[in-house]
Amino acid sequence: MTTINGGTVFDFTQRNRPVSKSVIIEDLNDFSSIHYLGSGAKGVSSSNPYKRIVFVLSGQLECTNRTTGHTWTCPEGSFTIFPGNCTTGFSAAEDTVALRIVVVNPTEIYSILEDEKAYDLKQLVPEQEDSSVFIHILSCGNTKIWAVTMVEGKFFEAETLNSNMVYMCLEGEVKITYQDKERILHENQCFYCLKDNGIHLQAGASPTRLLIMKDIL
């Protein structure tokens, strides 16, 4: 399993280098992993009862439901849901990095989301003047995922977190204060915050969009 220290700024897309026609898998925990697909890579996921939600962090993923023959494209900055109980295929014409979460016994998936469609994370949450907007994408055991849009100057904070959290900047920039130190996150960068710590986030541009992920590490 991957070990990332709390208080670390990192970029999932830079942790491994994709290899041509190959897939490198970095396990984050029992249910989530990063997949590094080199150009020309192809693969098949055998049928299992669980849905899988896949976030394409760079590149582009070509997806196939091999049971029905349906195909769809998931470009960089988007995500898709693979249905359970079917065999799925995927390929990448260019180097591609994706975060995959196996959805075991979900308690909630955002109601508008359908299987086998690509959703642009930057368009999922509308920008609202003088507001921060949160959409709860997924709850699955301890894992929870939110998409957030903030306008410049807006902030939110937690005095004490009860779980480990990853904050990923999708657009704009965000200033993070953690353990009395400030960091600036830019697009594609992540910050790992350990439970029992407080955190303060402030948007440095309009719009600033984040993906917040609980207990994926």
Locate predicted features.
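Ligand-binding loop in jelly-roll beta-barrel domains
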Residues: 84-109, 195-217
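Hydrophobic residues in beta-strands and at strand termini
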Residues: 37-39, 56, 74, 82, ...
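Histidine-centered metal-chelating micro-motifs
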Residues: 41-43, 62, 78-80, 84-90, ...
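Short histidine-centered beta-strand/loop micro-motifs
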Residues: 26, 42-48, 65, 72, ...
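A short, N-terminal "cap"/entry segment at the start of jelly-roll beta-barrel domains
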Residues: 1-38, 42-44, 71-76, 80, ...
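Short acidic-glycine-tyrosine-enriched beta hairpin
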Residues: 67-84, 179-196
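Short, conserved beta-strand element in jelly-roll/cupin
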Residues: 48-63, 150-151, 160-175
